[in-house]
């Protein structure tokens, strides 16, 4: 794979006593429904109804990922990709098994 690709899809980083899952996501703004699931080029696909204007799609994607992992919105942090459809997120307190489940949807 070329070096510019965002891999791996996820990794677990231990931060003190709390596990953090780092996830690469591919945001698809302007979708008919908000949905998290499936994969695209090694990234978790996040479909949001919000348009990619003024950070609305990014905010909607962070909220959707939080709901999909069963954590509060403030537990999801944008690490990279604020102006890109491909983003790296950190999800504090997430179960890594949830990511496996979401990738197979």
What label would you give each PLM region?
Residues 1-63, 68-73, 77-105:
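Contiguous, often N-terminal, cationic amphipathic patches that form binding interfaces
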